[in-house]
């Protein structure tokens, strides 16, 4: 314990460098959930997967752990080029003491800004820029993350809900057909969802639904 305290109180350059790296690592771990949710494609993916489960009316199948796990790995797959660039341009030089912490932050935010800008609607970005009374930026570097992140988040929410609406349509039709058949047969006390569930699962399996959903998500980026 004393050795750990001495690292923070030491003025030796090597110890100071180790202290900065440790603090940086702890900071990254503390803000990682927020970064993952709001600055990557995780938001769109997890919402679409949740819409799939809701439209099928399977309640807790697949479980939340499976959906979140799949969303995480899809996020890492889609964001791999961006993460690689951040590691190459910012993290590795910082760990090698070739650049300062401020330079590493500047270099790290460029790839993530570029990714977010590709999937952010101009209307959403203009909303936050106008509210902050910002001048029209000359380049992407002039847009702060405090403006880009919320604009990107609401753009992702809108896109995810649009995809979710398209997913709901075929299953809604099945529910309506089953409900009409049950009413015509006088079986109004029987829940239509109970009867339509096997047909919805059958349709989803026959069209290879998970493949189509994941393919659509990958192509949307």
UniProtKB/Swiss-Prot annotation:
Coiled coil: none annotated. The keyword Membrane applies. It comes from the Bacteria. It is a multi-pass membrane protein. Keywords: Bacterial flagellum, Bacterial flagellum biogenesis, Bacterial flagellum protein export, Cell membrane, Membrane, Protein transport, Transmembrane, Transmembrane helix, Transport. GO terms for cellular component: bacterial-type flagellum basal body; plasma membrane. Its main location: membrane. Plays a role in the flagellum-specific transport system. It comes from Bacillus subtilis (strain 168). GO terms for biological process: bacterial-type flagellum assembly; bacterial-type flagellum-dependent swarming motility; protein secretion. This is Flagellar biosynthetic protein FliP.
């Amino acid at each position: 314990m004393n050795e750990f305290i001495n690292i923070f109180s030491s003025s030796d350059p090597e110890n100071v460098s180790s202290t900065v790296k440790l603090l940086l690592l702890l900071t990254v771990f503390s803000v990682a959930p927020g970064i993952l949710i709001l600055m990557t494609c995780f938001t769109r993916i997890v919402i679409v997967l949740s819409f799939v489960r809701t439209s099928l009316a399977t309640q807790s199948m697949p479980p939340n752990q499976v959906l979140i796990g799949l969303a995480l790995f899809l996020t890492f797959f889609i964001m791999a080029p961006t993460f690689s660039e951040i590691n190459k341009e910012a993290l590795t030089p910082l760990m090698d003491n070739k650049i300062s912490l401020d330079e590493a932050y500047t270099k790290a935010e460029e790839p993530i800004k570029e990714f977010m800008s590709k999937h952010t609607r101009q209307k959403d970005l203009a909303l936050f820029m106008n509210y902050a009374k910002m001048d029209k930026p000359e380049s992407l570097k002039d847009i702060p993350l405090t403006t880009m992140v919320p604009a990107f988040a609401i753009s992702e929410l809108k896109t995810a809900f649009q995809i979710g609406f398209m997913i709901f349509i075929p299953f809604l039709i099945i529910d309506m057909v089953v409900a009409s058949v049950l009413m015509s047969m006088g079986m109004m006390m029987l829940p239509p969802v109970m009867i339509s569930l096997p047909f919805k699962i059958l349709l989803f399996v026959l069209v290879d639904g998970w493949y189509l959903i994941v393919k659509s998500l990958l192509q949307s980026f």
